[in-house]
């Protein structure tokens, strides 16, 4: 057996314990197979019973290796200043008790370090681990989002003063048919495709900073019918690098929750953000579009409505497109339970999102945009914020490509002269249920939050628009792992395009 007695460990540990920073010493061995006598001590901050400890890799378009999360664990130094990720050879090898102090013999293991300095050790077995102490008090470091740094990666962190950006739905607002089967949704027939795993939500603070909370869809707590908290509080978890290709640029860091018990946010309470205007079809019980010049138009499935100026549900203003387009209402996936909505087991809400149907030439060749007009008169604060959820396509492979990949958000006080606030917003195709689906297709609508200048507050009217930022086009590939943001538009490539907006809000950051 490779399990070592504590007395032996004491001598072996001298190799690293004598170092001023043993975790940095391990990082310096990146690319090597570690030699005999390399032992590291630390406190276990992960839980082997959790289904949310690591990202499960895509094996093929319709298969995910869900065992990776079970093989993943994290230890940090007793002072919480440094941490490493350890990956066991098998799921049954990972039995390190949470909050225990352990010593791990790293002989024969491999070390890798990513561009952010996050360190991973692979090749560990149960016999390599000795528990030195059963229970150790683990106090997470308390930080604001702006205070996070690379040295915090793979440590236990509490992020304070945050609230959910999108407080409707669940931790995973997804089409349940395309994600992992679990006790939540494994009653469906035909069986789930199980071709996508990780989903998640954002929290943000009173400065407009945000961080992604990735949630593996095997996690039972993710969508049990509970509503998300409304207030401002704190979340605790393991800080990890943010690399989630389906969701584009989600920031540098993400916070992995062990479970939703680590969310300490009041269910009710005030927000740092005040709604100026909101377009949201979730409570659209009449299944109608409210157009400025035509009033409520009853939605009929499969019948397009000529585009117009849509009246907001909250506040005053208009939402419209300058493209030659028609409107439709399509499902939204922001329900609290998989049983909610019009298709039990899917978790979708009938007529809960706006679909803008047009040709891609309208967006690539002209100056087409989604435009928002709103009055900010009477609103004060630190900034104006534009929040929206969106995706592209109709849930079919033939509508999952050919559209602009990168988009910009711009603002104006006169509707003519616009200033760019962001130009790297990614638009992903919504997951489709057949064909070799791209690894970049999203299981639900992506969340976006763009902070705009304070000078836009207190105005009779402001103009915000969302438009293509370049001629980079989403392509489809035989290899589903290949980057879809690789095409370049030309007129002969014009095709039908469905842009879907689940919700759009203009808010004042107080």
Q: What is each PLM-predicted segment?
A:
Residues 1-28:
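Bacterial Sec-dependent N-terminal signal peptides
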Residues 19-69, 76-270:
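OB-fold nucleic-acid-binding modules
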Residues 52, 166-171, 378-380, 390-403:
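Extended, low-complexity, turn-rich repeat/linker tracts enriched in Gly/Pro/Ser/Thr and Asp/Glu
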Residues 267-327:
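Extracellular carbohydrate-recognition regions
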Residues 281, 393, 401, 407, ...:
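Terminal, low-complexity interaction segments
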Residues 309-380:
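Surface-exposed, low-complexity/disordered Ser/Thr/Gly/Pro/Asn-rich loops and linkers
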Residues 365-367, 376-394, 459:
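Extended extracellular/luminal ectodomain segments enriched in beta-structured repeat modules
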Residues 409-412:
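Conserved Ser/Thr-centered positions that define the repeating blades of beta-propeller domains
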């Amino acid at each position: 057996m490779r399990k070592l007695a504590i007395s032996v460990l004491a001598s072996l540990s001298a190799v690293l314990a004598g170092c001023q920073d043993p975790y940095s010493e391990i990082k310096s061995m990146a690319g090597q197979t570690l030699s005999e006598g390399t032992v590291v001590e630390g406190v276990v901050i992960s839980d082997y019973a959790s289904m949310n400890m690591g990202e499960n890799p895509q094996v093929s378009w319709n298969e995910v290796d869900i065992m990776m999360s079970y093989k993943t664990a994290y230890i940090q130094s007793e002072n919480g200043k440094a941490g490493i990720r350890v990956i066991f050879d098998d799921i049954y090898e990972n039995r390190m008790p949470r909050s225990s102090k352990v010593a791990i013999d790293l002989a024969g293991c491999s070390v890798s370090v990513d561009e952010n300095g996050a360190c991973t050790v692979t090749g560990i077995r149960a016999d390599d681990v000795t528990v030195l102490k059963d229970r150790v008090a683990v106090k997470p470091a308390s930080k604001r989002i702006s205070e996070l740094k690379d040295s915090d990666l793979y440590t236990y962190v509490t992020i304070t003063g945050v609230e959910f950006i999108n407080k409707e739905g669940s931790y995973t607002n997804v089409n349940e048919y395309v994600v992992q089967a679990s006790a939540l949704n494994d009653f469906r027939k035909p069986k789930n495709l199980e071709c996508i795993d990780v989903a998640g939500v954002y929290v943000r603070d009173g400065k407009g900073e945000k961080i992604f909370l990735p949630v593996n869809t095997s996690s039972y707590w993710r969508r049990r019918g509970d509503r998300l908290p409304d207030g401002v509080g704190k979340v605790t978890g393991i800080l990890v690098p943010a690399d989630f290709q389906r969701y584009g640029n989600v920031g540098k860091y993400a916070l992995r929750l062990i479970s939703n018990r680590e969310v300490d946010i009041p269910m009710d309470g005030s927000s740092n953000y005040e709604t100026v205007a909101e377009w949201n079809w979730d409570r659209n019980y009449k299944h109608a579009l409210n157009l400025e010049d035509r009033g409520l138009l009853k939605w009929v499935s499969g019948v397009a409505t000529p585009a117009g100026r849509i009246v907001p549900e909250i506040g005053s203003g208009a939402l419209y497109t300058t493209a030659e387009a028609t409107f439709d209402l399509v499902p939204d996936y922001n329900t609290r339970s998989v049983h909610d909505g019009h298709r039990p087991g899917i978790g979708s809400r009938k007529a809960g999102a706006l679909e803008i149907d047009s040709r891609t030439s309208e967006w690539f060749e002209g100056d087409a945009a989604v435009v928002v007009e709103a009055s900010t008169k009477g609103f004060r604060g630190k900034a104006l914020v534009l929040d929206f959820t969106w995706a592209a396509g109709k849930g079919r492979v033939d509508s999952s490509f050919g559209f602009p990949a990168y988009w910009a958000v711009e603002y104006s006080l006169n509707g003519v002269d616009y200033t760019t606030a962001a130009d790297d917003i990614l638009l992903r195709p919504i997951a489709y249920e057949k064909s070799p689906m791209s690894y970049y297709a999203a299981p639900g609508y992506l969340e976006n939050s763009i902070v705009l200048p304070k000078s836009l507050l207190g105005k009779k009217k402001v103009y915000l628009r969302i438009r293509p930022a370049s001629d980079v086009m989403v392509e489809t590939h035989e290899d589903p792992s290949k980057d879809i943001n690789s095409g370049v538009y030309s007129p002969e490539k014009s095709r039908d395009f469905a842009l879907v907006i689940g919700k759009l809000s203009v808010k004042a950051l107080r």
